[in-house]
UniProtKB/Swiss-Prot annotation:
One Pfam family of this chain: Lactonase
Known partners and oligomeric status: Homotetramer.
GO BP term (any one): beta-ketoadipate pathway
Protein name in the entry: Muconate cycloisomerase 1
Amino acid sequence: MAVAPTSYDILMGTFRSPYLYTLTFDVLARKLQVREVNEATGGHNWLDVSPDGNTLYATVWGEPPKLTSYDIVRGGEYATTKLSRNVASQYMSGYVCSNNKAMYSACGPQVDTFLVDDNGTLLDQPAVQSFNLLQGQEKNKANGTLDFGGLRHGGHSADLSPDGTKLYVADIGRNCVWMYHVDRETGLLTEASKNIATRPHDGPRHAWPHPNGRIVYSLQEHSSYVDAFRLTDDNKLEFLEGGCIIPDEKDHDKYWADEVRLSPMADVVFGSTRGLEEGTPGFVTAWNLRPDGTFASTEATHRFQTKTSGGWANAIAVCPNLGPNGEVFMTLTDSEVGFIQILAYTSDKGFEVVDELKISTEKEHIMPATTVWL
């Protein structure tokens, strides 16, 4: 059983502020603190760490659209970041992931492939592949104004299968999850299938694979469901079952789901949702899983009501190892007020807030977005 170290470095981006935060979480003291505020090229709403752990990739919310790679500098008391390269993007990206050949970007109207060098740095060149996700008259709207609106109504995420041979792209606007085959020698993609969501109003936002490679969890932004799909023939996804993040009595139209992630042992799946307006708290929900990745029950094992709506965030990122008492640690970011929490979860006791840090100041409203654990 994997056991957490005594402390972790965590990197955190924001939606609008040019800062990258280095945080440390002391597992035994159960304490989270800011160690460094690194200079950033803009607001980084999504972060990804290269497979070797030496490069940070980031989306940039700003004009002109671009993507960024940073060197992760280690050797001191805590990790810091150093800019390695900016590259232009046709549209503002919402999500990136990487292997040792390429970085993949979901940016609303399309999915892009950017190549990286042997050190993981983005090459100083445009995307080598772009897959248009728009259909019919939608293509006429695909111009420079499709920034945040494009992300809200288009391709929103990109994640690789555990063996690195497939890329899953959740597309809110097309109500589907696209599958691409990955050439591991070159990093290039080939479109494989378009997998329509179960409900006409689902709006897939993120698609996260189980370590066994056969199950993919699709987070539905509009309906607040976490759905399990099975990879059927290496080309298509088949719906199995789903659980709702919010309680039955809540109005789905007042929420927009944000994130889906697994516990370190892949025996629990977590989903989070935000309130559409201030005064509507969001939820983080957990379901126990069978060893094959299917739901033990689609009824929630535990729910946690968040302190605020979460703003644009209420994003969870799970610690890669269990805590000393078998607990699952995760970060929860809030952009409404501007704080980050560490949550601990066990299937027996549910969720608890371990620590909280206010990031916003009286002089500046800072909007925490997402984190990565190092």
